[in-house]
Regions:
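Residue-level detector of alpha-helix initiation sites
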Residues: 11-12, 255, 382
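A conserved short coil-to-beta-strand element within the FAD-binding core of flavoproteins
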Residues: 146-147, 152, 172, 196-211
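N-terminal Rossmann-like FAD-binding beta1-loop-alpha1 element of flavoenzymes
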Residues: 3-30
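Conserved beta-strand-loop-beta-strand element in the redox core of flavoprotein oxidoreductases
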Residues: 201-243
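Active-site substrate-recognition segment that forms the wall
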Residues: 38-49, 53, 58-75, 108, ...
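Flavin (FAD/FMN) cofactor-binding core of flavoprotein oxidoreductases
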Residues: 117-121, 147-152, 269-270, 325-404, ...
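Rossmann-like flavin
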Residues: 74-186
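Glycine-rich FAD pyrophosphate-binding loop
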Residues: 23-44
Length: 416
């Protein structure tokens, strides 16, 4: 008899986890308090699919003192194991993303190629010093001259200073929400169920597994049973708390996970603003906008091509878990204009903000929670959605008792 697994949260992490579990033969039910998949943090996040490059990101992003202290303490504990395992997971994840696209026929408006801008000689020298270490981790990174970068991205502003660039093999961009929507359908074909507008109130061990208490919490304008809806959407459920037993559960619900875990996790909120606009198509100017992914660490900015649209993301800010941040969308517009001037239709801009969980050391929280039957798939953000597919695959393998494709022991919550 196959085991029953509850997945809490239907963001990209939850959907990929549900698919991988269903593909291994588990009976999967996904609980999501919103009305669809990838509605919250996954909706407005960066479109990048980036390998993990330790040491490249600037650790001086705005953050409260408490978080900086926790990051310092966690960094002393983490060691090289976590870094090497994350690099291996990064490689696996990008390969798994490509594999799912090909095997399942997913079309998430993907584009291949990722360049990281090095605006001056100082940043170029710093990156060059890290290059050997990255390659020792098995990461395929190449330092290219500015002229080569401009050949690969002909839409770059000729007047924007550029010393060199890092070219990341297997990196690229894609529409994370579109990927999640299509993978959800594949998970449903394997028997996974999705219950939207359903809030999980508590998870408790009862000796025979986990008892999950959930409640149907529809919005006031929720459709009736007779209303037209997409295939597979949740029908209205009985009102009031409902108890349901599962063999195991996976928390993919970000900042809400500690409440269900019943323990304190050193999580902060990472905020990221994004602007999405249609690519400007002008006869005689075929190279407006990026061909794929472009990152400017000095401006905390990423620009990514997704089909006929461009997504600009940045303004990463870390706060306490419940704090809010006013996004600076104008900074994103200025950054886009700096690198790819005149490339989008500003009259049709969509603005958004992602708010996701971030661990004390900035690394994912993956694996067994320490409570029997309860697993974690949290804190995957920061540099796009490059870790998502591999994390889900490895976690499903561990739950199934299989040998994981890569070791993630150092990425478990026990390190914190």
């Amino acid at each position: 008899m196959s085991r029953s697994i509850a997945v809490v949260g239907a963001g990209l992490a939850g959907v990929t986890t549900a698919y991988e579990l269903a593909a291994l033969g588990f009976q999967v039910q996904v609980f999501e308090r919103g009305g669809s998949v990838a509605e919250q943090a996954s909706f407005a996040s960066s479109a990048l699919l980036s390998p993990f490059l330790p040491g490249l990101a600037d650790a001086s992003a705005p953050a409260p003192l408490g978080f900086r202290l926790r990051r310092w303490r966690a960094g002393r504990k983490g060691g090289d194991d976590a870094v090497s395992q994350l690099a291996a997971l990064s490689r696996l994840s990008l390969a798994r993303t490509t594999e799912l696209r090909h095997e399942l026929g997913l079309d998430d408006e993907a584009s291949d190629g990722l360049l990281i801008a090095l605006a001056d000689a100082k940043r170029t020298a710093a990156a060059e010093a890290l290059l050997e270490g990255w390659q020792a981790l098995g990461l395929q990174v190449e330092l290219i001259e500015a002229g080569e970068a401009r050949l690969r991205e002909p839409g770059l502003n000729a007047d924007a200073p550029l010393s060199a660039a890092l070219a990341l093999a297997h990196g690229g961009a894609g529409n994370a929400r579109l990927f999640a929507q299509q993978l959800r359908l594949q998970a449903q074909r394997l028997g996974a169920g999705f219950r939207f507008h359903t809030t999980v109130r508590a998870i408790a061990a009862d000796g025979a597994g986990l008892m999950l208490r959930h409640e149907y919490t529809p919005p006031a304008e929720a459709p009736t049973r007779s209303a037209e809806r997409e295939a597979g959407d949740t029908l209205p459920q009985p009102l009031g708390p409902q108890d349901e037993r599962f063999d195991a559960a996976v928390l993919c619900n970000g900042l809400d996970a500690p409440t269900l875990l019943g323990e304190r996790l050193p999580l902060s909120a990472q905020h990221e603003a994004s602007v999405t606009a249609p690519l400007r198509l002008v006869e005689g100017y075929p190279d407006l906008g990026p061909k794929a992914g472009w990152v400017d660490p000095s401006r905390d900015l990423s620009v990514a091509r997704a089909g006929q649209r461009v997504r600009v993301s940045g303004g990463l800010t870390v706060t306490d878990a419940r704090a809010r941040v006013n996004p600076d969308y104008e900074a994103l517009h200025r950054g886009l204009q700096h690198w790819f001037p005149g490339s989008v239709l500003h009259q049709q801009v969509q603005q958004g903000q992602a708010r996701r969980a971030m661990s004390a050391d900035g690394l994912p929280l993956l694996g067994a929670s320490g409570r029997p039957g309860l697993w974690l798939n949290l804190s995957l953000g920061g540099q796009g959605w490059g870790l998502t597919c591999g994390s889900a695959q490895v976690l499903a393998q561990l739950i199934a008792g299989q040998a994981p494709a890569v070791d993630i022991a150092a990425l478990g919550p026990q390190r914190l």
